[in-house]
């Protein structure tokens, strides 16, 4: 029976044929290893590597679907010497150590198999191959059919008419499987399965370091065994063996050949304690898809596997207490009952708000926003979970008033800033902020690598609850649409969100306490939520007419550049097509280039920047790219974000970056270009209200000051204390040049070194940045560390601590996990070390600017000023102020920014004023 026959057996169910029972045996380490190397690296939101486990399960599920076995067992190797090592010390001696990412997944797959109730067998002193061989023989004697699943072709020796060896190949496109019984092995290799051992004895096996006979390769070994059937017969007729070298070596290395045969032979009677009843799938394959395994698949985020599990998420009693409230009397009683309790709340937005959320613009401030609620969901105990709907009796204004005036012990929100916007929160005084809890911000601090913190993820990670996600409940519909289609789904989604927020609060706070981040949460991150809410509400005025004029100006420049490029190329072509551009530059014009790849020539910026100084067409192309990006991203892109109040209300994201920095989206106002004049001019479209002006302050070299303070390097600290130009000072030290004689070029190079050190730059990176040799760049770095020795000590110690702990910390206790430090991939580890060097510096700087934002925002309110903080761009704060308040605001702004932190190095602030953002910057 061939492999194809094996897969195409047809049984007539009408015939009373008793089918043989079937045992599937899986070579655990082999399949895990094959899956690991066959799939790209995968990690879940916890940072766990999962590709090997995922691939293993995919292969196993495919086998189970095809085989539908009665028995199932997985064999694993034990990390200990076997009898083969005692026979031959160098056995498997050439194998590299297992990658750490793969090693971490061995206990994970064992946990998964155990959760599925699958029998696992290991035996010290023997390999998994010996276990598989022993069990296959026992099963065949018991009248079973056997399928052995392995990536190791050594197991082909086990194939019989009732034992099929199946070898999977894992690819991105899926899993392909080769099938071998006796006939298949003979057809493919020209020898029987048992003779396959003798082939290995002659040719050896480099993967297992089985020596074999020198000079005999796969082809010769196969031909000899096909003729003689065993190595003993080959040796007996050695004088007639061809070629002559094989004849000579089979005699000279005969003892080695015998040893190789013994090493290659799988033991069929290993002392394995095993009962078939332990591996019996009494409930069929379906019995493997247990709730425990389902939970692990959810944890590892194997979403496309979940449908296999005919189990529901673990039940909790919460859903039994979800109550929909539509009448005013009941709503009043619910809010009365909630008084003086810890209340989780979320505003379920009305239709117009939700529709605008899907169009890519910032929904909270678009023209279509209405103040209408669909509902408010609240939770204040395990039994008190309500979905209070607007309708004939309950109005949005009623709910709005309750959320703003209800006296509670504390307010809890799954996403506080979003919900403050949705019910248009009245001003919340600084003293009252501590009465609020933000689930999303707390979860972010605990694990800042995830980037998203929906209620179902928080429930899974911190409460052990497997809840359906918002997407699972609503799909592509909004709440209003789902209420019409399936009210229960909409209600369950909204209620589970507030239930999770309410239930997770003590757990998250305890976790923050254990991680020493409770102060960071209470004093910085939570107050910042309210500051960002106010800033987003304020927005920044954008002049649509000026924006169009700016776009028109760019269009003229782009057209002129196109003409220049076409003239230089001698023809018109698509400048935005890398393929066409590559042909023009490197074939038609003959510019020097790197080797052409399958996809064509590289026209990436780093490639073109090297050519630009010598070739004007390349410089024009780079400028063309800059201008077209400016036009599409800013001139054209920003106009869609101007709301009915004439302002752009960006979203300031608090829970996105791993380092703690804020980001800006919808639109991104932190990424306004500053290096080219045409890019900087975009700031001219941003204006204060008539009669007002902008005050703009930014920290001077904040990250270098933080580096000096954290490292305690006296020389750098002294330079800052003396008010020296730090880059000129560094140039003087590194290039051994008197301070007053430092050239502009030396200062520029020193500046690159200063900021490069902050980001853990290598000699290779610095050489590219400065256009110098790697040796010269390394000399700069070495000289830098000689002059600033404590910086070197600090960076080295930071990396060591990060490797030990798995994370870095800022001055204020912010943790940044760095899983890359444990990678078996050298480049990933190098990246992890650079992250470790930079994170405490960049993270501390981010903490400082956040503290400054809170201080400035609160002082403006405390002083009763009309001026407002409206924008933050990394180390820069922008205030819109009245002319009469200008002087007071400047003093206030600089004082609060300088006073944000007490370090060995003072924070210096530069301030400018102007009637548009360009002039103020």
Per-range role (PLM):
Residues 512-524, 528, 848, 852-873, ...:
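Active-site palm subdomain of RNA-directed nucleic acid polymerases
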Residues 172-200, 369-514, 524, 556, ...:
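Active-site-proximal helix-loop-helix substrate-binding element of RNase H-like nuclease domains
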Residues 377-382, 446-476, 493-500, 654-738:
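Function-dense linear segments that define catalytic or interfacial modules
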Residues 556, 560-563, 567-619, 786-834, ...:
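C-terminal polymerase-core module
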Residues 253-391, 411, 434, 477-677, ...:
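Conserved "right-hand" nucleotidyltransferase catalytic core of DNA-directed polymerases
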Residues 10, 20, 40-44, 93-272:
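Extended two-metal-dependent nuclease catalytic cores across DNA- and RNA-processing enzymes
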Residues 23-24, 28, 34-73, 89-90, ...:
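Conserved RNase H-like, two-metal-ion catalytic cores of nucleic-acid enzymes
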Residues 481-483, 537, 649-650, 654-657, ...:
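Conserved catalytic core of nucleic-acid polymerases
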């Amino acid at each position: 029976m061939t492999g194809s026959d094996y897969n195409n057996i047809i049984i007539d169910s009408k015939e009373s044929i008793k089918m043989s029972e079937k045992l599937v045996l899986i070579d655990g380490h082999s399949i895990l290893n094959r899956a690991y190397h066959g799939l790209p690296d995968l990690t879940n939101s916890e940072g766990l590597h999962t590709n090997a486990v995922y691939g293993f399960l995919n292969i196993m599920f495919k086998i189970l679907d095809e085989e539908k076995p009665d028995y199932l067992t997985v064999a694993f190797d034990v990390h200990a010497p076997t009898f083969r090592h005692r026979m031959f010390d160098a056995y498997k001696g050439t194998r590299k150590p297992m990658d750490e990412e793969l090693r971490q997944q061995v206990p994970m797959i064992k946990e998964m198999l155990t959760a599925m109730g699958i029998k696992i067998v290991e035996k010290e002193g023997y390999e998994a191959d010996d276990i598989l061989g022993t069990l296959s023989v026992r099963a065949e004697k018991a009248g079973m059919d056997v399928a052995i699943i392995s990536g190791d072709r050594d197991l082909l020796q086990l194939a019989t008419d009732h034992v099929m060896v199946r070898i999977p190949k894992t690819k991105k496109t899926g899993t392909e499987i080769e099938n071998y019984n006796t006939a298949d092995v003979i057809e493919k290799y020209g020898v029987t399965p048992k003779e396959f051992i003798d082939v290995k004895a002659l040719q050896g096996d480099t993967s297992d370091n089985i020596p074999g006979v020198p000079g005999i390769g796969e082809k010769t070994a196969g031909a000899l065994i096909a003729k003689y059937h065993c190595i003993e017969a080959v040796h007996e007729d050695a004088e007639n063996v061809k070629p002559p070298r094989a004849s000579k070596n089979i005699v000279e290395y005969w003892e080695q050949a015998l040893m190789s045969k013994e090493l290659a032979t799988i033991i069929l009677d290993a002392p394995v304690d095993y009962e078939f009843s332990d591996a019996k799938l009494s409930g069929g394959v379906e019995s493997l898809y247990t709730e425990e395994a389902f939970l692990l698949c959810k944890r590892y985020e194997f979403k496309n596997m979940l449908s296999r599990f005919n189990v529901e998420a673990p039940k909790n009693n919460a859903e039994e207490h979800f109550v929909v409230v539509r009448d005013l009397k009941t709503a009043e009683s619910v809010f009365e009952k909630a008084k003086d309790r810890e209340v989780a709340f979320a505003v379920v937005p009305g239709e117009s708000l939700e529709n605008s959320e899907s169009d890519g613009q910032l929904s909270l401030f678009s023209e279509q926003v209405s103040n209408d609620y669909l509902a408010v969901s609240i939770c204040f105990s395990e039994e008190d979970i309500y979905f209070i709907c607007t309708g004939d009796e309950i109005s949005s204004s009623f709910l709005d008033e309750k959320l703003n005036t209800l006296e509670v012990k504390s307010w809890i929100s799954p996403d506080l800033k979003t919900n403050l916007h949705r019910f248009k929160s009245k001003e919340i005084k600084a003293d009252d902020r501590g009465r609020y809890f933000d689930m999303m911000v707390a979860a972010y601090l605990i694990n800042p690598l995830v980037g998203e913190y929906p209620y179902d993820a928080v429930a899974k990670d911190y409460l052990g609850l497997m809840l359906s996600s918002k997407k699972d409940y609503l799909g592509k519909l909004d709440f209003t649409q789902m209420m019409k289609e399936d009210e229960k789904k909409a209600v369950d989604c909204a209620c589970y969100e507030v239930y999770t927020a309410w239930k997770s609060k003590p757990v998250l706070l305890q976790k923050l306490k254990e991680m020493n981040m409770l102060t960071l949460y209470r004093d910085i991150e939570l107050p910042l939520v309210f500051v960002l809410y106010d800033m987003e509400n304020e927005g920044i005025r954008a002049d649509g007419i000026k924006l169009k004029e700016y776009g028109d100006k760019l269009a003229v420049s782009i057209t002129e550049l196109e003409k220049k490029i076409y003239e230089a190329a001698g023809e018109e072509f698509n400048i935005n097509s890398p393929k066409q551009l590559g042909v023009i530059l490197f074939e038609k014009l003959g510019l020097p280039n790197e080797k052409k790849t399958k996809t064509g020539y590289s026209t990436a910026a780093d490639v073109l920047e090297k050519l630009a100084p010598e070739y004007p067409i390349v410089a024009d192309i780079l400028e063309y790219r800059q201008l077209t990006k400016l036009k599409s991203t800013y001139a054209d892109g920003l106009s869609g974000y101007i709301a009915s109040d004439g302002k752009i209300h960006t979203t300031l994201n608090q829970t996105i970056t791993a380092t703690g920095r804020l980001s800006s989206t919808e639109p991104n106002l932190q990424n306004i270009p500053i290096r080219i004049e045409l890019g900087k001019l975009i700031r001219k479209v941003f204006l204060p209200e008539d009669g007002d002006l902008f005050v703009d302050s930014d920290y001077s070299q904040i990250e270098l000051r933080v580096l000096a303070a954290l490292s305690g390097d006296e020389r750098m600290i002294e330079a800052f204390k003396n008010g020296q130009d730090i880059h000129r000072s560094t140039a003087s030290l590194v290039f051994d040049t008197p301070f007053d004689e430092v050239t502009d070029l030396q200062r520029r190079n020193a500046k690159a070194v200063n900021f490069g050190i902050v980001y853990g730059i290598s000699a290779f990176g610095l050489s590219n940045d400065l256009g110098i040799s790697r040796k010269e760049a390394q000399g700069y770095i070495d000289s830098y560390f000689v002059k600033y020795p404590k910086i070197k000590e600090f960076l080295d110690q930071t990396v060591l601590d990060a490797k030990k702990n798995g994370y870095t910390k800022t001055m204020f206790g912010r943790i940044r996990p760095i899983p890359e430090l444990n990678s078996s991939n050298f480049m990933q580890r190098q990246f992890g070390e650079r992250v470790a060097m930079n994170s405490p510096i960049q993270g501390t700087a981010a903490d400082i600017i956040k503290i400054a934002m809170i201080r400035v925002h609160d002082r403006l309110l405390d002083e009763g000023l009309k001026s407002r903080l409206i924008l933050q761009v990394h180390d820069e704060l922008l205030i819109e102020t009245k002319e009469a308040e200008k002087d007071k605001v400047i003093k206030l702004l600089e004082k609060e920014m300088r006073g944000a932190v007490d370090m060995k190095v003072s924070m210096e602030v530069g301030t400018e004023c102007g009637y548009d953002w360009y002039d103020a910057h």
